Amino acid sequence: MGYNAGSYDVIVIGAGHAGCEAGLAAARMGSKTLMLTINLDMVAFMPCNPSVGGPAKGIVVREIDALGGEMGRNIDKTHIQMRMLNTGKGPAVRALRAQADKFLYQHELKKTIEETPNLTLRQGMVERLIVEDGVCKGVITQSGAEYTAKTVVITTGTFLRGEIIMGDLKYSSGPNNQQPSITLSEHLEELGFELVRFKTGTPPRVNSNTIDYSKTEIQPGDDQPRAFSFETTKFILDQIPCWLTYTSEETHRLIDKNLHRSAMYSGMIKGTGPRYCPSIEDKVVRFNDKPRHQIFLEPEGRNTQEVYVQGLSTSLPEDVQREMLKTIPGLENVEMMRTGYAIEYDAIVPTQLWPTLETKKIKNLYTAGQINGTSGYEEAAGQGIMAGINAACRSLGKKEVILGRSDAYIGVLIDDLVTKGTNEPYRLLTSRAEYRLLLRHDNADLRLTEIGHEIGLIPEERYERYSQKKEQIEQEKARLEGIIIKPRPEVQELIRSVGGSELKDGIRASDLLRRPEMTYEHIRLLAPSELEINDEVAEQVEIQIKYEGYIEKSLQQVERMKKMESKKIPVDIDYDAISGIASEARQKLKEVRPLSVGQASRISGVNPADISILLVYIEQGKIARVSNQ
């Protein structure tokens, strides 16, 4: 028998990286929020690699922080190492990556959730949704508890009908041998959702005390203090290194010999795996010309001897995994503490979602994270904060928030999912963003803090600091535009020292900074400011002046795109009534139901001729409505 267990504005199912951001965002915006999770000990658990950030992903963490989310602050408090990647490349592809103390990461985030007003965290497995007349009204748990809500967010990760696979061993399980969620998956199918089967995997963990580090290469963190959050002022300087080793020809021979025992190659696994995180079996087969592959040894925390063997994700049986580890330099005598495994799980086809992450089929129901077909903690958290924001907005009667492709990587991620769908676990890459020069690591706050403040996630004190920073950047840029640096001996000497051409005449400080060999630090020496300019402001001034021409070109492209985005498509449009559209385009348009002509133009199978016909039809419809009035 069921019983009434309470009423909420927002209910979040799951407390992984998507669920944590969704629950915190909704509660901080003033919605009475309930987070339900199968196991309270697994809040913010990292079932795979103990790290946050990296190319594109690190920028997402900055964006979450700029909106008022928690991931950046939490990793800043709990990392064991931090590095800026791609420092030799342009600012568009630079990204921060941190190694996490995964246990401390969990502990700190759970503590934050427990201490957040308006937020209740409870253990319980949701088996069904309460749906009336196509509207989600709440959830029912395994124990019969019925919780009603104005909105519900599903963030179930890889738990939906999860199955762990190692060799010919296969059993029903969530990640790390947790209880899977089977009934909810079946219920979503009953409600008419189209589900797909995806697969991911994880490598073995080994005991640090049994590694011969003398045969590996040290990978230290950066000496310069770094942080993901724009709020962080205390930095962890006591860092722990990672270590680099490689597979050997013996490793590859062993894998080839046992390929028939890999679940990936025996036919045991039916789900599609992630393209950009292949198993070691895949790497050996697909890149058989490579004599070795990189293996990174990543400590899982400060108070554990467990080491994550990055690059060795596998579904080979346990006995082969043990042998395989011993063929790697430094791991000849290693003790395996946990086996690697593959996991298959259900995901929904994401074209069934609106750009707000609300499902098209059921009103007031949102989904975020791996259930939407993505891979990665950061992608999940980015969707989680947006689903939480929009679920809260709906519950509070406010306008929902949609980030565009020129606003954030989160916008690129969600637009790709809901417009194009995905036939494999989706990973965010810098190459997916056409405006990546605008979507940089360094300017996430300038892009998104105002949105976070407007919806109530950025407090006044933080917004005031942001406004001062923005003003300082503009003032310093204007100062450098107005200062003339003359060819004095000390100026010529500095320019010569960095390999530049000497000045013939006076030059504006901003123009001198545009030279590739010059930095803001050089300009500061030649034309010091009376005000103290901090590093964040200096970085912005340098990037905005140096890349001004390229940024201007990107902004012009954005303006053209926004014209297409501003041409809205009526939600109730009848695509069958539009003659001349190709049948594939008609089918895709009916499936995705784009909200704008811009979104329609990004659907695969919809070509420019179809867009032209659609534009004419919409314009004619507007004319007809006006003439009827």
From Swiss-Prot:
Binding partners and assembly: Homodimer. Heterotetramer of two MnmE and two MnmG subunits.
Protein location: Cytoplasm
InterPro entries xref list: FAD/NAD-bd_sf, GIDA_C_N, MnmG, MnmG-rel, MnmG-rel_CS, MnmG_C, MnmG_C_subdom, MnmG_C_subdom_sf
Biological classification of the source: Bacteria, Bacillati, Bacillota, Bacilli, Bacillales
Alphabetical keyword list: Cytoplasm, FAD, Flavoprotein, NAD, tRNA processing
Gene (name only): mnmG
The protein's name in its UniProt record: tRNA uridine 5-carboxymethylaminomethyl modification enzyme MnmG
Residue numbers binding NAD(+): 273-287
Residues engaged in binding FAD: 14-19, 126, 181, 370
